[in-house]
């Protein structure tokens, strides 16, 4: 059965990075978005996914982006109205976002990444090596370019897709409790709906149901996420969201001295926390 095309995109699309997520996303884009394969380019740092790209007739370029070459590489590939889909690691999301804001390019990624080595850079204080710091850096760009092209960062599964499910869940509860409700269109609107429903905190947990071969043994830890991401983020300081209602504070906890201060961090890497 022929799949329905939900949208027609006339611009160019550039993948930055083409690991497992990229290879899984490409056929979905071609299935659900009307755009010719010759307007898609894959820009990546290694040979992974070449066969997948060839199967769909997609241009495949191996040329790792670095802080001193990204503009030269991207300039011929992207212009106003085009789309950069960032699925890479070790490439600064903030740098790519600002590049897109300056050129009118649409942007989407699954997480905010730094340049290679930032997580373990001893010249930076722990606070500056955190995901909190990466997020604050991106939020500053929103203020710097208030009327630029649309940028959606950290829209993977969680955070990202889970936000849509949470909103749908809130609407289901509202329908059962309050009757017909108007769907909120702003952040403040969703906050007001949460107050009406008596919601104070929403915690999203994941249960991994993947089964590999050979099967995981008892007491064995198996990582089913990105290996690169798992290792690099495990070396970052452990981070916790921290609300105004908290009644205690960890013995080795520290507060950030910049940004919205909605999180704290521990003075040790995440991989050491039990």
Model region roles, listed by residue range:
Residues 91-105, 110-148:
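Rossmann-fold NAD(P)-binding glycine/threonine-rich loop
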Residues 65-78:
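Conserved Rossmann-fold cofactor-binding substructure of NAD(P)-dependent oxidoreductases
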Residues 21-24:
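Hydrophobic/small residue at the entry helix of a nucleotide-binding pocket
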Residues 14-19:
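Conserved N-terminal Rossmann-fold NAD(P)-binding element of oxidoreductases
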Residues 199-274:
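Glycine-rich, aromatic-lined ligand/substrate-binding cores of catalytic
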Residues 36-54:
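NAD(P)-binding Rossmann-fold cofactor-contacting core
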Residues 126-223:
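Rossmann-like NAD(P)H-binding beta-loop-alpha module
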Residues 1-11:
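A short, basic/flexible loop-to-alpha-helix module at the beginning of a structural domain
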């Amino acid at each position: 059965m022929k799949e329905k095309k939900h949208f027609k995109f006339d611009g160019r699309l550039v993948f930055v990075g083409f690991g497992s997520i990229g290879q899984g996303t490409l056929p979905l884009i071609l299935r659900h978005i009307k755009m010719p394969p010759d307007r898609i380019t894959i820009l990546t740092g290694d040979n992974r996914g070449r066969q997948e790209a060839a199967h769909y007739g997609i241009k495949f370029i191996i040329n790792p982006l670095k802080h001193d070459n990204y503009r030269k590489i991207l300039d011929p590939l992207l212009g106003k109205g085009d789309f950069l889909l960032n699925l890479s690691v070790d490439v600064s999301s903030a740098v790519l976002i600002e590049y897109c804001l300056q050129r009118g390019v649409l942007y989407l990624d699954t997480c905010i990444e730094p340049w290679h080595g930032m997580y373990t850079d001893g010249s930076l204080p722990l606070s500056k090596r955190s995901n909190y710091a990466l997020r604050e850096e991106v939020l500053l760009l929103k203020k710097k370019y208030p009327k630029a092209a649309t940028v959606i960062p950290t829209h993977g599964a969680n955070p990202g897709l889970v936000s849509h499910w949470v909103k749908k869940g809130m609407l289901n509860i509202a329908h059962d409790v309050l009757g017909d409700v108007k769907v909120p269109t702003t952040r403040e609107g969703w906050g007001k709906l949460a107050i009406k429903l008596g919601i104070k905190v929403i915690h999203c947990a994941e249960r991994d149901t993947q089964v590999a071969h050979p099967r995981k043994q008892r007491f064995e830890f198996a990582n089913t996420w990105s290996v690169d991401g798992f290792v690099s983020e495990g070396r970052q300081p452990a981070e916790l969201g921290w609300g105004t209602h908290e009644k205690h504070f960890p013995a080795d906890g520290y507060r950030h001295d910049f940004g919205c201060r909605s999180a704290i961090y521990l003075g040790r890497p995440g991989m050491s926390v039990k």
